Curated annotation (Swiss-Prot):
The modification Phosphotyrosine is found at residue 529. This is Ribosomal protein S6 kinase alpha-3. Activated by phosphorylation at Ser-227 by PDPK1. Autophosphorylated on Ser-386, as part of the activation process. May be phosphorylated at Thr-365 and Ser-369 by MAPK1/ERK2 and MAPK3/ERK1. Can also be activated via phosphorylation at Ser-386 by MAPKAPK2. N-terminal myristoylation results in an activated kinase in the absence of added growth factors. Residues 1-26 are annotated as: Disordered. Transmembrane segments: none annotated. Disulfide bonds: none annotated. One of its GO terms (cellular component) is nucleolus.
Length: 740
């Protein structure tokens, strides 16, 4: 199974002469063809000032730059910057916004018209799935747009990380997008630049359409526009051939986006702009057979080269799309009211955190003095966002840029070596196929852990993929870097300075049931999150549950070592989640997944048993043979009475027995564990000292013997990453934008 797509979406582009750019560039700048929104009499040498009136947030006073504190840079290009700002005065003081700043001196007349148009469109638009403009104002030299700050980054980043989405994910995003486009169309606006980079995610995971620099309000009497603009791969045929286009062009781009999200590739993409345009006009599109009949049908109806025949172009407009069988399960009223839960919720932290924004920008000191970099092109103004590992430490900002770039480059076998950036220290742990060491990042002197995996013994793809997807969870170890030198893979993570959870608990002089409940709640909540995403850990032994610091607080617990973890996949390689699997996953795969999830709960039951009593349920010490241990486990018999159990409550014993049930089908799920009275009513649990066996070394040996017996027959054989269908099919070429 392949590593997630990690190529850098923002490749630096060399400055080209106008003639070269027109011939070779993939990006299409607005070129007047036929009727155009710009007065043909206007020349660059006689630029006229565009009057941008102030816009004030309803119920608030007029704004100016002095009312906003600059916190971070979110994006930067040749014409200006986007800042994360905090309002420091007025009735909305302390509110966070994104502030788009443009220098008038660097804007040509066409760019000024676009900026004015973007401002006017945003003032007019009020929709739950379209970014909101709160203020617009200008100074003598600059233009300012104050917009929603959307913490979740853009859809392009998530697509790059996931490779492709499930059909249920795509259905959700497309449905919200359809409502947003329909609202724009109802106002006479053609969006014209639909692509993942321009679809942002708010903190709940709902979409927000943004960047209206290429949108078109002024159209002729036939309701057609003639500008040749946007990103070529997403252009409709009528835009490419310059015969005039209507709002129907947005529905073609809607189809391109759908195809890309479902397959991980673009439907029409040649080696250069000219070939791509030819494919859009003439190429026959092969429909991937792993797509459902409903998805294939919708794509065929969107990819009609005659715009009049395209779904959504008829008199009913978006209703044609909403009635299509692909969206049959969507409740459109609930969707509009934001009552349907998104498939992905961005990690939450402090309000000003910028986990999903490019550290190339966020690491810069924010100054409201945008310059013109020598190699900047017009379309680079609002470059998007790339995956950044979640972290709550301010000091980690210096580390993030290095981490992201090394992850980006590791698939390309570049010349960068792990030891170029890190100094290797002592061993932390040694396994059968890997060794874990402490390491120090040379540039920042920060400590990390590195897991060095021998690729000849184990394919680390699944482990890295899971950490990339779910490492933003506060109780899952955070991935910082990945290097691949061909023989070994170096997985750099945060350092677990607090040590193993069980070690700390067993050495703790005072430990109560209430404390044990808090620990189990944190771990089980994390496991429930993984299981809901179709991920099973399969090796939840206590040595893989550690503290990130010395505090001992449940919040500092991290689940580590996903070397045996698995993600639920359909037969075609698509990642799935349990609620969407009925039509895509073989029953035996689901059965195995359910068994593995039950094994995770069993492991947590062993941990709970040991926390409460100070000894393990199935092994007496490190000298027990595997046969003896497996026989006890298979019998399902363990003691819950007498001795150390006399100080344990009946509700705790009930939970232990249900988590360690010998029949995996009768074992509690993670969700049911969280609903058990011992977890729910934690504040009513005893706070007195548990009477436990005081022999931590003996317990640790017994625990190691237990999991050694369980894992001794596990020897999975995995083929190299490159042989997987998904890896061969993946090859997304990153698209940049000409939009302001």
């Amino acid at each position: 199974m392949p590593l997630a797509q990690l190529a850098d979406p923002w490749q630096k582009m060399a400055v080209e002469s106008p003639s070269d750019s027109a011939e070779n560039g993939q990006q299409i700048m607005d070129e007047p063809m036929g009727e155009e929104e710009i007065n043909p009499q206007t020349e660059e040498g006689s630029i006229k000032e565009i009057a941008i009136t102030h816009h004030v947030k309803e119920g608030h006073e007029k704004a100016d730059p002095s009312q906003f504190e600059l916190l971070k840079v979110l994006g930067q290009g040749s014409f200006g910057k986007v800042f994360l700002v905090k309002k420091i005065s007025g009735s909305d003081a302390r509110q966070l916004y994104a502030m788009k700043v443009l220098k008038k001196a660097t804007l040509k007349v066409r760019d000024r018209v676009r900026t004015k148009m973007e401002r006017d469109i945003l003032v007019e638009v009020n929709h739950p799935f379209i970014v909101k403009l709160h203020y617009a104002f200008q100074t003598e030299g600059k233009l300012y747009l104050i917009l929603d700050f959307l913490r979740g980054g853009d859809l392009f980043t998530r697509l790059s990380k996931e490779v492709m989405f499930t059909e249920e994910d795509v259905k959700f995003y497309l449905a919200e997008l359809a409502l947003a486009l329909d609202h724009l169309h109802s106002l006479g606006i053609i969006y014209r630049d639909l692509k993942p980079e321009n679809i942002l995610l708010d903190e709940e995971g709902h979409i927000k359409l943004t960047d209206f620099g290429l949108s078109k309000e002024s159209i002729d009497h036939e309701k057609k526009a003639y500008s040749f603009c946007g990103t070529v791969e997403y252009m409709a045929p009528e835009v490419v051939n310059r015969r005039g286009h209507t709002q129907s062009a947005d529905w073609w781009s809607f189809g391109v986006l759908m195809f890309e999200m479902l397959t991980g590739t673009l439907p029409f993409q040649g080696k250069d702009r000219k070939e791509t345009m030819t494919m859009i006009l003439k190429a026959k599109l092969g429909m991937p057979q792993f797509l459902s009949p409903e998805a294939q049908s919708l794509l065929r109806m969107l990819f009609k080269r005659n715009p009049a025949n395209r779904l959504g172009a008829g008199p009913d407009g978006v209703e044609e799309i909403k009635r299509h069988s692909f969206f049959s399960t969507i409740d459109w009223n609930k969707l509009y009211r934001r009552e349907i839960h998104p498939p992905f919720k961005p990690a939450t932290g402090r309000p000003e955190d910028t986990f999903y924004f490019d550290p190339e920008f966020t690491a810069k000191t924010p100054k409201d003095s945008p310059g013109i970099p020598p190699s900047a092109n017009a379309h680079q103004l609002f470059r998007g966002f790339s995956f950044v590992a979640i972290t709550s430490d301010d000091e980690s900002q210096a580390m993030q840029t290095v981490g992201v770039h090394s992850i980006v480059q590791q698939l390309h076998r570049n010349s960068i070596q792990f030891t170029d950036g890190y100094e290797v220290k002592e061993d932390i742990g040694v396994g059968s196929y890997s060794v874990c060491k402490r390491c120090i990042h040379k540039a920042t002197n920060m400590e990390f852990a590195v897991k060095i995996i021998d690729k000849s013994k184990r394919d680390p793809t699944e482990e890295i993929e899971i950490l990339l997807r779910y490492g933003q969870h506060p109780n899952i170890i955070t991935l910082k870097d990945v290097y691949d030198d061909g023989k070994y893979v170096y997985v750099v993570t945060e350092l677990m300075k607090g040590g193993e959870l069980l070690d700390k608990i067993l050495r703790q002089k005072f430990f109560s049931e209430r404390e044990a409940s808090a620990v189990l709640f944190t771990i089980t909540k994390t496991v429930e999150y993984l299981h809901a995403q179709g991920v099973v850990h399969r090796d939840l032994k206590p040595s893989n549950i550690l503290y990130v610091d010395e505090s001992g607080n449940p919040e500092s617990i991290r689940i580590c070592d996903f070397g045996f973890a698995k993600q639920l996949r359909a037969e075609n390689g698509l990642l799935m989640t349990p609620c969407y699997t009925a039509n895509f996953v073989a029953p035996e795969v689901l059965k195995r997944q359910g068994y593995d999830a039950a094994c995770d709960i069993w492991s947590l039951g062993v941990l709970l048993y040991t926390m409460l009593t100070g000894y393990t349920p199935f092994a007496n010490g490190p000298d027990d043979t595997p046969e003896e241990i497996l026989a006890r486990i298979g019998s399902g018999k363990f003691s819950l009475s007498g001795g150390y159990w006399n100080s344990v409550s009946d509700t705790a014993k009930d939970l232990v027995s249900k988590m360690l049930h010998v029949d995996p089908h009768q074992r509690l799920t993670a969700a049911l564990v969280l609903r058990h009275p011992w977890i729910v009513h934690w504040d009513q649990l005893p706070q007195y000292q548990l009477n436990r066996q005081d022999a931590p070394h003996l317990v640790k040996g017994a625990m190691a013997a237990t999991y050694s017996a369980l894992n001794r027959n596990q020897s999975p054989v995995l083929e190299p990453v490159g042989r997987s269908t998904l890896a061969q099919r993946r090859g997304i070429k990153k698209i940049t934008s000409t939009a302001l």
